[in-house]
Amino acid sequence: MNTISGEFESGTIVPLLAKPVSRTTIFLGKIFAAFLTLLVTYTLLIAYTTLGGLLIYGPQNNLHLLPISLLGSLFSTLIWVAIVLLLGTLFRSSLIAATGALGIWLGTNIIGSIIGVLAGQGWILTYIPGSGNNGSVGGNPLVGTAVSTGTDNIGPNLINYILHPSWDVTYYKIDLTNSTQGTPIWQALNTEPISAIVFTSIVVALSYFVVLIAISWFVFKRAQVTE
C-alpha cells in the first residue's frame, strides 16, 4: 500500500490520476487499503500475543473480549491514520507526515500529563487525540486502578466497561501548596462513570476522523499535479 504522499514523491500520482477513475475513488481506496492493513496487522498481533500467553501461562480468562480489543485498537489508530493522511496530502511528503504525527502524539502525551497532574486541567485532553486525562478507580493514582480517557485507550476502556460497568473514575491533581518533599498530596477534582468515558472517546475519535478525512479529500481533489 502506498500513501498519497508516497504517490506524489515517487511520481506515480501522474499515471494514477490519468486512469479513468475519479480522485474520490482513489482517495477512498487509499483509506480502505489503510483500514485493511491495520485490520490484518492487529489481528496477527493479537493472535500472536494470545497464543504466546496460552503457551506460557496456560488458559486465560475473558478471551471472548479479544474482538472488542481489536475494534478499539482500530478506532484508536484510525484517527492517527487520518492525521498522517492530512499532513501527507498537504505537504506531499511522507517524512513530514510521519514526523508531524509523531510530534503531535508525543506533545499530547508529555504536555498532557503535566497539565492534568499539576494544573488540574486534564479534562481538555479528553477532546484532543492522544492518551487523554488520567484518572483512577479505588483511590488516588498511587493506590487505585489507572484509567486514561483519551482516544488511544478506546479498546481498554471498552473492556473495562464490559467487565466493570459500575466503575466511577476519579481525577486528581497534586496539591503543590500542601505537599511535602517526597510526599505528594492528591486532591480529587471530579468523578465520571466509565460509560461516559467510553462514549466520549468514541465520539471524539469519530469526529476527528470525519473532519480530517474531509479536509484531506478536499485538498486532494484540488491538488495541482504536473508531470
Where are these regions (language model features)?
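Helix-loop-helix units of permease transmembrane domains in multi-pass membrane transporters
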Residues: 2-35
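Secretory targeting signals
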Residues: 27-100, 109, 116-117, 131-142
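Generic recognition of short, well-ordered alpha-helical interface segments
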Residues: 65, 82, 98, 102, ...
